[in-house]
C-alpha cells in the first residue's frame, strides 16, 4: 500500500511537470529564450521588445526529490513575543518535493533620462511534503516574492569583465502564514551584472527595511546582507553558484551557499541538480542550519 502511495505521488509530480512545462514553453516561446544579460534585460536597442511581455527571471524547476539532513520540525523565531512560541514539533519527512516559478515583465521603458527600465517580477518557491501520507501531504512552506526593479544599462570593464547593468529593487518576501509561523521581510536590493565569455556574475547587496511588527528580527544575521551569483554556460550545461553572507566575519559568520547544474537530456528535457548548505533555504528555515540535495528537471535556466 505504501509503495502504491509513493508511485501515485511521483505520478502526480510528473503529470504536473509536463503540464506546466507545456504551458511555460508556450508562454516563453523561442523569442524569449534569452541567452545573455543584454537579451534577458533588453539592454540595447536591438533587444528591446516593448512592455508587458512576460519573460523569464530566475530559474524554474521541479524537484520530485529534495533531501534535508536536518528537517525543521519545530520552527522558532528570533522574536521573543509569546505569539511566536511554536507548538510541539511536526513529524516532517526529510524527503519532499520542491519547485520554483519565476517571471518578470517590463512596465515602463526609457525612464530616468531615457536609459532605465522599470520591471515587475514574481518568484514563488514551494516545498511539498508529497510523500508524507501521515500528514495528508501538506505544503510545508511556500514563499512569495514580488519585486519592483529599476534596471539601467551600463558599459565599462572591470577585472576583465564587461559591466552590463546596474539597478535597484524593492523586494518583499513572505510565507503567508499566521503566528507563530509568519515570516517576512522587505529589502532594498542593489544589483550589478557582469559578463565575460561563458561567465555571468550578479552582485546583490541589500538593506533590510524596518517593520513595525517584525516576524524575524534577526533574519539578516542568518540569511545574509548580500549575495553573489556566478553562472557558467557551455554546451547546453549551465552551472550556477550562489553564496550569501551576513558580513559578520567573527565566529558568528553565517549565510548560505548553493550549487546548481542544468544539463540537457533530450530535446527540451533538462535535468537539474541543486545542492545547498547553510541558513535560509526558505523563510521558515531562516535560522535552521541544513544541507539539502535535490534532483529533478529544469524548465527555465538563468541563461
Predicted feature residues:
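Long, repeat-rich segments with strong aromatic
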Residues: 227-228, 232-242, 246-274, 279-282, ...
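Outer-membrane pore/translocation modules
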Residues: 73-86, 93, 108-232, 243-245, ...
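Intrinsically disordered, low-complexity linker/tail regions enriched in polar/charged residues
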Residues: 24, 32, 174, 209-211, ...
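Short proline/glycine-enriched turn/loop segments at secondary-structure junctions
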Residues: 4, 283-287
Amino acid at each position: 500500500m505504501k509503495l502504491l502511495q509513493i508511485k501515485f505521488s511521483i505520478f502526480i509530480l510528473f503529470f504536473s511537470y509536463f503540464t506546466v512545462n507545456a504551458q511555460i514553453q508556450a508562454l516563453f516561446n523561442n523569442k524569449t529564450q534569452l541567452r545573455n544579460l543584454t537579451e534577458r534585460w533588453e539592454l540595447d536597442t536591438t533587444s528591446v521588445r516593448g512592455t508587458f511581455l512576460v519573460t523569464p527571471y530566475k530559474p524554474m524547476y521541479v524537484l520530485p526529490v529534495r533531501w534535508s539532513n536536518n528537517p525543521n520540525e519545530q520552527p522558532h523565531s528570533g522574536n521573543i513575543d509569546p505569539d511566536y512560541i511554536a507548538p510541539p514539533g511536526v513529524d516532517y519527512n526529510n524527503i519532499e518535493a520542491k519547485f520554483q516559478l519565476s517571471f518578470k515583465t517590463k512596465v515602463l521603458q526609457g525612464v530616468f533620462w531615457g536609459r532605465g527600465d522599470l520591471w515587475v517580477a514574481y518568484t514563488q518557491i514551494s516545498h511539498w511534503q508529497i510523500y508524507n501520507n501521515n500528514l495528508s501531504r501538506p505544503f510545508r512552506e511556500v514563499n512569495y516574492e514580488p519585486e519592483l526593479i529599476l534596471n539601467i544599462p551600463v558599459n565599462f570593464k572591470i577585472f576583465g569583465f564587461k559591466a552590463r547593468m546596474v539597478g535597484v529593487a524593492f523586494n518583499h518576501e513572505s510565507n503567508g502564514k499566521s503566528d507563530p509561523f509568519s515570516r517576512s521581510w522587505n529589502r532594498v536590493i542593489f544589483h550589478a551584472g557582469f559578463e565575460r565569455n561563458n561567465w555571468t556574475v550578479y552582485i546583490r547587496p541589500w538593506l533590510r527595511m524596518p517593520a513595525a511588527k517584525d516576524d524575524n528580527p534577526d533574519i539578516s544575521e542568518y540569511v545574509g546582507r548580500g549575495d553573489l551569483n556566478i553562472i557558467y554556460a557551455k554546451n547546453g550545461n549551465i552551472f550556477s553558484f550562489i553564496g550569501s553572507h551576513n558580513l559578520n566575519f567573527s565566529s558568528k559568520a553565517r549565510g548560505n551557499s548553493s550549487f546548481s547544474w542544468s544539463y540537457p537530456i533530450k530535446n527540451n528535457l533538462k535535468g537539474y541538480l541543486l545542492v545547498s548548505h547553510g541558513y535560509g533555504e526558505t523563510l521558515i528555515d531562516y535560522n535552521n542550519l541544513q544541507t539539502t540535495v535535490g534532483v529533478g528537471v529544469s524548465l527555465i535556466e538563468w541563461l
